[in-house]
């Protein structure tokens, strides 16, 4: 139920299972998501046949069951582009042809059962009584005048024997919208998906050792992410059982490939590694440690791959050179064939985003300060001076506030000194574009008025302090008055 509630209306869930529990999983999925939202079950061949198996039958497949939250989900993949023609009579208007007949008989559609005549040549094309024309005798002239009917003699290169419909590419694009060029997905997975051994090889190559057994391949996970995010390349991908973080690897690799901005959320219990395993000996105490390190190493590998760089001429059309870009980085020069260096590999855009943050679930930052009267004593009054737990850092408090305000945890932040106080700015804005900072926080004790004024003058959307930032109640009240003066629209909070 949690997974369903987290999905967007066009969201989808993929669940991997073996033969033993496939039936039960599909029944459970139908109960939670509804039978009508069952999408498909994809068979993934995870290994080659084994010989020492019960009944002499090797169960080589794993099943990936897919359910959608609603009928708004549509899977799409890149297909072979339709063949369009461009001719002199219709310059810059690509077109294609389509069958001009229907499955209706002459008895069913008598008004479409007529002999079609080419107005240019007078050649006749009798109707097939079992497949009448898609136009009527009355509408034929209009369709022909609009250029929507093509005869065999019009374009010999078509090699057709009967009239055909002409469809314009512009109409196809208008009708399909953002789905243009995409096609439905088959449950037959592509040949490059690989098996479990390929997944093991991938992670072994990354770590120079076998630190995780039988992970799924990056290509397998990439395939599923790709078919659900062909249109929405800013989708959020959540993996409840992230393991070695193959999903994170796949998201970063796919983003680098198609320029997407997909985000990943990996969830994993800190399951300890076997002390006899290679992973433990290599210093990875938990599966989480393996996943974090894989994301780091995979990210660095992706940044180094040539696919992340673009080829541009040494002398660009605008007259600038690659070195003119402040972000440009020349990687190598390519010989174009004449012995002269004519192309360089230059980074002309941002590097792939391979950053990530690690969070550990914990209880609240606040102390349990609700005591009954008999629980109070002179000895525990000192413990009640602060309502925040002693082991909490500024970042603990900052990200706790983000959760309270419902802000995303993936935005950039910076810390700086204003006077002697540490001030944190989360999701910095842009003064030139009149975009305010999302949040400014200061959790120091006894924050002076000049620091508060400086924060207020920046007019952030939100500002937060801790109770101990002020020596007295009047000072706390003064903070709100300062913001009313300098930044009346700022939401101020004291924790």
Give a label for each model feature.
Residues 408, 426, 430-495:
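Long, compositionally biased intrinsically disordered regions
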Residues 53-60, 280-281, 371-378:
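Short, surface-exposed amphipathic charged segments that create phosphate/polyanion-binding patches used
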Residues 388-406, 410, 463, 473:
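Glycine- and aromatic-enriched alpha-helical transmembrane segments of multi-pass membrane proteins
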Residues 206-213, 237-240, 254-257, 278-287, ...:
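Short, contiguous acidic/charged loop-to-helix segments that flank catalytic cores in large enzymes
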Residues 1-236, 258, 269-277:
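Class I S-adenosyl-L-methionine
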Residues 406-423:
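Conserved helicase/translocase motor-coupling segment
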Residues 1, 40, 49-52, 223-234, ...:
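Cysteine-dependent PTP/DSP-like catalytic domain, specifically the C-terminal lobe
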Residues 234-254, 402:
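A phosphate-binding catalytic loop at a beta-strand-loop-alpha-helix junction
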């Amino acid at each position: 139920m949690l997974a369903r509630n987290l999905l967007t209306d066009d969201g989808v869930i993929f669940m991997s299972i073996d033969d033993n529990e496939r039936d039960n999983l599909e029944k459970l999925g139908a109960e939670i998501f509804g039978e009508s939202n069952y999408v498909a079950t994809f068979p993934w061949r995870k290994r080659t046949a084994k010989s020492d198996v019960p009944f002499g039958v090797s169960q080589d497949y794993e099943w990936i069951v897919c359910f959608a939250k609603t009928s708004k989900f549509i899977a799409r993949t890149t297909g072979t582009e339709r063949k369009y023609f461009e001719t002199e009579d219709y310059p810059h208007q690509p077109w294609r042809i389509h069958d001009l007949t229907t499955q209706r008989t002459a008895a069913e559609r008598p008004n479409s059962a007529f002999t079609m005549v080419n107005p240019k040549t007078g050649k006749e094309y009798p109707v097939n009584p079992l497949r009448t024309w898609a136009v009527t005798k009355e509408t034929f002239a209009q369709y022909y005048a609009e250029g929507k009917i093509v005869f065999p003699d019009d374009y010999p290169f078509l090699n057709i024997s009967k009239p055909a419909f002409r469809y314009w590419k512009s109409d196809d694009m208008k009708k399909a919208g953002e789905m243009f060029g995409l096609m439905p997905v088959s449950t037959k997975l592509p040949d490059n998906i690989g098996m479990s051994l390929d997944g093991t090889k991938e992670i072994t190559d990354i770590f120079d050792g076998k630190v995780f057994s039988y992970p799924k391949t990056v290509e397998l996970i990439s395939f599923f992410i790709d078919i659900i995010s062909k249109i929405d390349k800013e989708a959020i991908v959540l993996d409840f059982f992230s393991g070695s973080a193959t999903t994170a690897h796949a998201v970063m690799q796919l983003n680098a490939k198609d320029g997407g901005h997909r985000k990943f959320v990996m969830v994993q219990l800190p399951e300890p590694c076997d002390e006899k395993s290679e992973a433990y000996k290599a210093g990875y105490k938990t599966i989480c440690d393996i996943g974090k390190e894989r994301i780091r190493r995979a990210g660095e590998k992706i940044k180094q791959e040539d696919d992340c760089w673009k080829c541009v001429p040494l002398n660009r059309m605008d007259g600038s050179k690659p070195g003119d870009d402040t972000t440009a980085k020349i990687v190598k020069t390519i010989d174009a064939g004449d012995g002269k260096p004519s192309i360089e590999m230059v980074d002309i855009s941002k590097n792939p985003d391979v950053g990530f943050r690690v969070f550990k679930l914990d209880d609240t930052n606040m102390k349990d300060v609700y005591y009954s009267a008999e629980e109070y004593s002179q000895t525990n009054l000192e413990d009640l001076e602060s309502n925040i737990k002693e082991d909490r850092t500024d970042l603990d408090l900052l990200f706790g506030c983000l959760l309270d305000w419902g802000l995303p945890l993936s935005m950039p932040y910076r810390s700086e000194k204003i006077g002697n106080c540490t001030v944190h700015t989360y999701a910095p804005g842009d003064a030139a574009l009149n975009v305010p900072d999302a949040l400014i926080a200061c959790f120091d004790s006894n924050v002076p008025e000049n620091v508060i004024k400086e924060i207020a003058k920046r007019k952030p959307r939100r500002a937060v302090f801790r109770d101990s930032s002020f020596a007295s109640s009047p000072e706390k009240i003064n903070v709100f008055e300062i913001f009313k003066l300098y930044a009346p629209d700022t939401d101020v909070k004291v924790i």
